[in-house]
Amino acid sequence: MDYRFQRRLAAEILGVGESRIWISPDPELREEIEGAVTKADVRALIKRGVIKVLPEKGNAGHASKVRHLQRRKGRRRGMGRRKGVATARLDPKERWMHRIRKIRRYLRYLRDKQVIDRKTYRRLYMLAKGGTFRDLASLKRYMADRGLVPEEKIR
């Protein structure tokens, strides 16, 4: 029951892959199928429904849908699931907001306590806005290096 030749012809005729060709397993049709050696013979078998095209398989996607729903509920997001550094999972804008708010809060504190004047506050504020300071520590270093604030006033 070797129908490789007929399968190849049917695949050519129907324009699909050989794996999608279904040939009837009926033993009574065996000789007739084996005798089909021309494209015309195979076409006749296709017309009679002895040879058919199987539907495409495709990807089910069910597992990924279930995973997605679980993640929406907050599952599968624990420490053991995480790869990469913590900052890789943080939105860059979110990181920027945390950083700039901390720096601005500190600058406001210094201005309100009159440790720095309005002019210095404004200059440092604009530098912070421009991304000059990587974190609060770098702002404090900057102020200490330039003597903008006495050492003991930098808390």
UniProtKB/Swiss-Prot annotation:
Gene Ontology MF terms: large ribosomal subunit rRNA binding; structural constituent of ribosome
Gene Ontology biological-process entries: translation
Keywords: Ribonucleoprotein, Ribosomal protein, RNA-binding, rRNA-binding
Quaternary structure and interacting proteins, as annotated: Part of the 50S ribosomal subunit.
Taxon lineage: Archaea, Thermoproteota, Thermoprotei, Desulfurococcales, Desulfurococcaceae
Listed Pfam families: Ribosomal_L19e, Ribosomal_L19e_C
Record organism: Aeropyrum pernix (strain ATCC 700893 / DSM 11879 / JCM 9820 / NBRC 100138 / K1)
NCBIfam families: PRK08570.1
SUPFAM superfamilies: Ribosomal protein L19 (L19e)
Entry similarity comment: Belongs to the eukaryotic ribosomal protein eL19 family.
Functional summary from the UniProt entry: Binds to the 23S rRNA.
A GO cellular-component term linked to this record: cytosolic large ribosomal subunit
Composition skew (Basic residues), residue ranges: 66-84
Lineage top rank: taxon: Archaea
Sequence segments annotated as region (Disordered): 66-85
Name of the protein in its database record: Large ribosomal subunit protein eL19
